Amino acid sequence: MKLKFSKHTSERKVNRLKKKIRIRKTVKGTAERPRLCVFRSGKHVYAQIINDVDGNTLVAVSSLGKEDKSGIDMAKLVGMEAAKAATAKNIKDVVFDRNGYLYHGRVKSLADGAREGGLNF
């Protein structure tokens, strides 16, 4: 797959997107074991549980509107909330997709929160 970027795209973003494509070649979500995808912006963290076979999102959770905590603590709460919503839909096993980000900080905290909430990776 050939990627096209504008000349203003930062090298850091280009490298993350290349990593994302490499990871997505191996990480696929199914109906029995969907994919837990993480996205982090400058202020917020988003988590989705996706069935790639049907192409639909089963659960979506974010830190928008939850301003009482920030950073790592908020990411952990988002992970626990995603796990709670997933177990309500009888989802216990997921594949973790870090989306090209390093497994560190908010991404790791979200994964730990999801594990504490009852999801198995």
Swiss-Prot record:
Keyword presence, Ribosomal protein: yes
Transmembrane intervals: none
GO cellular component annotations of the record: cytosolic large ribosomal subunit
Domain of life: Bacteria
Pfam family, one: Ribosomal_L18p
GO MF entries: 5S rRNA binding; structural constituent of ribosome
InterPro entries: Ribosomal_uL18_bac-type, Ribosomal_uL18_bac/euk
Entry keyword set: Ribonucleoprotein, Ribosomal protein, RNA-binding, rRNA-binding
A GO BP entry: translation
Keyword Ribosomal protein appears in the UniProt entry: yes
Entry function: This is one of the proteins that bind and probably mediate the attachment of the 5S RNA into the large ribosomal subunit, where it forms part of the central protuberance.
Family, as annotated: Belongs to the universal ribosomal protein uL18 family.
Subunit details: Part of the 50S ribosomal subunit; part of the 5S rRNA/L5/L18/L25 subcomplex. Contacts the 5S and 23S rRNAs.
Protein's recorded name: Large ribosomal subunit protein uL18
